[in-house]
């Protein structure tokens, strides 16, 4: 699905979304059929919409799923977060691609604009 097509779904969700949660899946980068998320971004930056009703309550974030959308990059297989590691995280054998980071940024910016959210929300 294109960002332009996703704009329509975002417009349909105006007033029903207060938060955007961004994730990495921790799966192999080819795994995009993950229904706990609203949108999954593949290794090339392509968008895969899991649910066209963006107000549907999903299971992407523990105890914070109401009135939110979950956007995930399909990446970071074998990633580990370290409390005492100098970098804080090892992004694993499949770190996010530049295309995924750009696609995440573009979708987040468009969602904030359409939904009337800010980075403080």
Question: Model regions: which residues?
Answer:
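Active-site-adjacent loop/helix surface patches within enzyme catalytic domains
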Residues: 1-120
């Amino acid at each position: 699905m294109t960002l332009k097509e996703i704009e329509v779904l975002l417009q349909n969700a105006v007033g029903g979304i207060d938060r955007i949660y961004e994730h990495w899946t921790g799966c192999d980068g080819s795994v995009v059929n993950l229904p706990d998320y609203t949108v999954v971004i593949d290794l090339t930056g392509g968008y895969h919409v899991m649910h066209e009703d963006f107000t549907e309550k999903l299971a992407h974030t523990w105890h914070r799923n109401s009135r939110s959308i979950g956007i995930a990059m399909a990446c970071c297989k074998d990633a580990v977060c370290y409390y005492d590691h100098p970098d804080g995280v090892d992004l694993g054998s499949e770190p996010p691609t530049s295309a995924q980071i750009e696609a995440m940024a573009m979708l987040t910016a468009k969602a904030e604009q359409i939904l009337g959210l800010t980075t403080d929300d």
